């Protein structure tokens, strides 16, 4: 007897969000292990997970590759039962994509509203008709593009692939009707009749057991219905997870989806763990009374020939003028660019490089891609939007002369093969950064230029991470909010593998408690599951054909944004082009700084005007580590590296950007490079044995980095030149280095590379360190070209900070949020550099921060209304986009004040309120921010005066009488507001204070505990000195290359101090490290010869509760006696100390309002 065979057609993956209990890859492997003929991925109204299953079929670990059926489970809003839809070929697949797009584009983000009428429209012969010109919005009209523009663009019918518009013929979508567990025979019969009338010969009725004790009777009813309708029945297990062990997790997902708990979910949960992939023998046993239903699965699978290999991508042709080919136009633009960038001519070497690149571009047929990116950059520059390309594209001389990148090929050793390679059959990838405040203009240009049916943003899969997994599992299991919050608060950053027993104990919980243990176990299992789709940060897919015939398109949450269901890895797998239109805050800052310099100093600068070798003052500033606000070098690690590296030229900045990265650090390349740079170690170049090759083969590769590999390009060249990798092996190595997801695959190259290097006589330590560096690049490393692109912005931002600190401070504040530091630190740094900063004031401030008349060497910075938390103001760039789109202006309170002030100065608060007509909430916010000083009112007096005003919208007849009554009322004398309360109020309203720092009012408190200032810590040179220091936590950083070490920056009234927290200390004081706003640190001083000082923490105490003293009136501490001044510092218990009982809960704040006194730290990982 032949062994039974079976194809499972009803697989639900975890891309049916909060329903499926397994990844698509899990199903592929399980189907391979079970020997199934085929598996059909059919997620709920989506194709989001199919590429992952498709890509997994290439996994070498698969002993057997089942056939993959690409489909979707269509769920309707009009009561039609669910239908599995499987296209038989490329044309049918295109119609399915467009059907799903239609449902998604009429619904909100993450939803799909389908009706049976939609099914009729896309299965019948009318499916050949394109969408009408109103397609981009359907029932959700665009809010930023004029309708006439949309119609003109979107009505075009581009030539190319049929995109699913071919006449039906044998191109079919196969339908399987899926009856629910409880069904009415009439409803199923009616649905079958409608489906067969629509798609005769291509309809099945699913026969799925649910293992609830009535399967025999229920399946018999369904067979009778199928026979009466003359459609075949087909077996399926209606699979929810690949293995029974995932049943509990699937129950949790059900509870999360339905917002209930395990105890209350009842029949919404499966009563068993049977809905998993089953082997053919088991399905044959279950359907022994109807084996033909099992055999039907094979006939069904045989009907389907479509695979994702059939998706053939075509570049858009808009950038190509009539009468030219794309390659001809690219070469013409290249010649024009050479004349622009090199007016005195180019060297023979550069000419040969450009010719080589153009030849390879022609061979790979990539000219359209380069022209498309050039077109987008050209538009941005025509609108005075700063932009520059980066990444591997900066290896291209053609990109430079086209104006896409800024890396001069005469300054940097380019490796074009890292960008485009003859051996590599994959599209190039050019990342272009635009001003973050004006990027939307560029994005809407792309929609107008290519049409919304041919352009959309790539998706990003939002995965469960430790915090979200713990919170959702805790809710599903019925844990109280305080328990789940306590567990979640022990997690650092976004990613992680779960919770340790120590973390559970530090949350004040018992890890041996069965419920807590189960919650931790399920949360760990849930980490990495997709939660929902979101739009990518800026990756666009552009096509010559209809994009909605490749992949479904849906609405983003943001108006006028649409995105596809596939992420960047998916489109790489199917070889579709992506253009990255990214946002970079520093470009906004630089442009706004240039505008301020032009407005107030009469000099107009462009990026190209700032020459990186012109100003030695800039390099001297960086050598001192004064880089707050400077692009890429403002982290504590970079600020500590600057005095050690002592950059003196542009290429030093390239190295500075790249050296504080996992690659060089893990490869132990940093210290050898610094020793050689500082003359403490001779510069030597690794070499092979004499008989194995040229002893100087690495000198050309490593010459600029003193014999130490620091960049990805160098690692690749070492693999090729020294380890003798073939071009294909080198390409595989490049791919393994390229992204986070491939960190686990890079190890397979280890033995080959190290073995080849040692076999050729290279030192074993060098060989191992080289590969450790490559593994570091797999986490996060910079290629030389990318570092060079960023180094240009490092220099420009450092130049502005050095030469125009007033404009730099103002531009930084107007570009928030961005960077490492909050406005308080930006303002503090500017004031330390002799820039006067003036408070928000109704008589002088605008919506944005502005520059006022000179005060000494620099202009004064006036804080704008944007600094007031909750105050309405409109960004000028965003407002311009709104007005150009024909939308009404924003409700801009700041603009009202500026307009009223233009008619004359304000004489009183009452007059101000009357002529600005601001709502009372706006007046209260201004008074809270102490913005009425120019009217003779401090914060308390202004708040009192505002509260005396009538409520909003007074009746005209009584307005004058009300005004007279206010004039007659005598002002009550108010006690003076203590300065400490003013500082607290400043931080609560404008997030900074020009009046003082909170710590100066607590200095007497800390002095009794022998706490030194941050300045004393930073200026000490005594290694090993034990000190206590307290400060506001500004930044917490846990770099991936630091092996779990956390770097904290704290601030008091004297400056900042750098704190190092080792992993063992972090585990002991996790709550304090992660949660404290005001922290006391005890430890030892660690001072380097270059003057970099750290306080290495041994104990930490959360002293955030002390902030309550500022708002409640300062409690006077006992006066010190002076008897302990010469005693050795010992570790007596401090307020809130948990040294002897680390599992005890940390001290809590006295009142919830105290949490809001200080802004939260900016945390990075």
Curated annotation (Swiss-Prot):
Encoding gene, per UniProt annotation: dnaE2
GO annotation (BP), single: DNA repair
PANTHER family assigned to the protein according to its UniProt record, in alphabetical order: DNA POLYMERASE III SUBUNIT ALPHA, ERROR-PRONE DNA POLYMERASE
SUPFAM superfamilies assigned to the protein according to its UniProt record, in alphabetical order: PHP domain-like (SSF89550)
Record's compositionally biased regions (Basic and acidic residues): 1152-1165
Entry's Gene Ontology molecular function annotations: 3'-5' exonuclease activity; DNA-directed DNA polymerase activity; nucleic acid binding
Identification of the protein by name: Error-prone DNA polymerase
An annotated GO cellular component: cytoplasm
Keyword DNA damage: yes
E.C. number(s) listed in UniProt: 2.7.7.7
Function: DNA polymerase involved in damage-induced mutagenesis and translesion synthesis (TLS). It is not the major replicative DNA polymerase.
Keywords: Cytoplasm, DNA damage, DNA repair, DNA replication, DNA-directed DNA polymerase, Nucleotidyltransferase, Transferase
Organism: Rhodopseudomonas palustris (strain HaA2)
Top-level taxonomic group: Bacteria
Pfam families: DNA_pol3_alpha (PF07733), DNA_pol3_finger (PF17657), HHH_6 (PF14579), PHP (PF02811), tRNA_anti-codon (PF01336)
Chain spans, region Disordered: 1111-1165
Gene3D superfamilies: Metal-dependent hydrolases, Nucleic acid-binding proteins
Location of the protein in the cell: Cytoplasm
High-level lineage: Bacteria, Pseudomonadati, Pseudomonadota, Alphaproteobacteria, Hyphomicrobiales
InterPro entries: DNA_pol3_alpha_NTPase_dom (IPR011708), DNA_pol3_finger (IPR040982), DnaE2 (IPR023073), DnaE2/DnaE/PolC (IPR004805), DNAPol_HHH (IPR029460), NA-bd_OB-fold (IPR012340), NA-bd_OB_tRNA (IPR004365), PHP_dom (IPR004013)
